[in-house]
């Protein structure tokens, strides 16, 4: 008999009492969180979800509190419940995706980000999470595809171009990398973090290539002569790609005291060619 009574739905009066308690607990959780008492806030909000197990917002709030307290598993569980109760709601899905990325659970993050794109097809947030996750999973082509979509949706955002530059650099496509870094530099405010990052990335690429170019020039006077005559063309012919600033710095490093008459002499026979005559 007692079991049957507990299985009966609450009376209207009891339901009103429980809803009022849930509201008080929700407000108390907010107050406690504002005071930095996250553990107590989580306890209050958890009780709200027990009173209202079908309330997606209650689980969403619990998930945010747990994430702030770095209780990752509990946060993921609460946010998943929220997305299950309200599958078309954007905010819980974004919070869940972000939590999974922060926890380095990239496969799961990809799944949630893809689900988010079904809700918000033009979501830059979802694509940002996808590009990070694909990069960490070693899926560079997919990461490039997603960042390409980000550039298309928001072409004036220098951060998108910088990320594409990083991906192109990882794929050893220096021409594309320099192009994207240069765009990021041109679009950024000189005091912004993106400007600094793009400037440092270009300088690093330029410095690495400049060392290789100067080494080649020290061993091949014919290449050195071509550098003196047409720097950009000579660099490109050898497969290098420097930024405008890199070309300017290289120009000042080329030894211009190299005798002009040496260009009239035939190029020396390489060791490989000489070997054929032995």
Across the structure, where does each feature detected by a protein language model lie?
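Canonical positions in the second alpha-helix
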Residues: 47-48, 81-82, 115-116, 149-150, ...
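Canonical tetratricopeptide repeat
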Residues: 27, 61, 95, 129, ...
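Alpha-helical adaptor scaffolds
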Residues: 64, 80, 91-107, 111-149
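Register position in tetratricopeptide repeats
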Residues: 34-35, 68-69, 102-103, 136-137, ...
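Alpha-helical segment of the N-proximal tetratricopeptide repeat
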Residues: 15-57, 61-68, 95-98, 102
């Amino acid at each position: 008999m007692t079991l049957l009574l507990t299985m009966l739905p609450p009376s209207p009066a009891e339901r009103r009492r429980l809803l009022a308690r849930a509201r008080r607990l929700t407000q108390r959780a907010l107050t406690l969180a504002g005071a930095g008492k996250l553990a107590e806030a989580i306890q209050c909000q958890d009780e709200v979800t027990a009173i209202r197990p079908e309330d997606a917002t209650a689980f969403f709030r619990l998930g945010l509190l747990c994430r702030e307290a770095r209780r990752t598993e509990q946060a993921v569980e609460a946010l998943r419940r929220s997305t299950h109760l309200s599958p078309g709601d954007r905010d819980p899905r974004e919070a869940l995706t972000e939590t999974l990325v922060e926890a380095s659970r990239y496969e799961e993050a990809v799944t949630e980000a893809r689900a988010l794109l079904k809700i918000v097809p033009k979501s830059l947030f979802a694509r940002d999470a996808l590009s990070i996750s694909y990069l960490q999973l070693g899926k560079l082509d997919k990461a490039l595809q997603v960042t390409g979509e980000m550039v298309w949706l928001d072409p004036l955002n220098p951060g998108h171009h910088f990320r594409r530059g990083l991906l192109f650099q990882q794929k050893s496509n220096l021409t594309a990398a320099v192009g994207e870094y240069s765009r990021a530099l041109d679009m950024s405010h000189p005091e912004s973090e993106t400007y600094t990052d793009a400037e440092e990335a270009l300088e690093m690429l330029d410095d690495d290539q400049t060392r290789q170019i100067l080494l080649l020039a020290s061993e091949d006077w014919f290449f050195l002569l071509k550098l003196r005559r047409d720097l950009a063309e000579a660099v490109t012919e050898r497969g290098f790609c420097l930024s405008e600033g890199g070309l300017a710095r290289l120009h000042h490093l080329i030894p211009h005291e190299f005798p002009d008459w040496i260009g009239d002499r035939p190029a020396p026979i390489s060791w490989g060619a000489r070997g054929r005559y032995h």
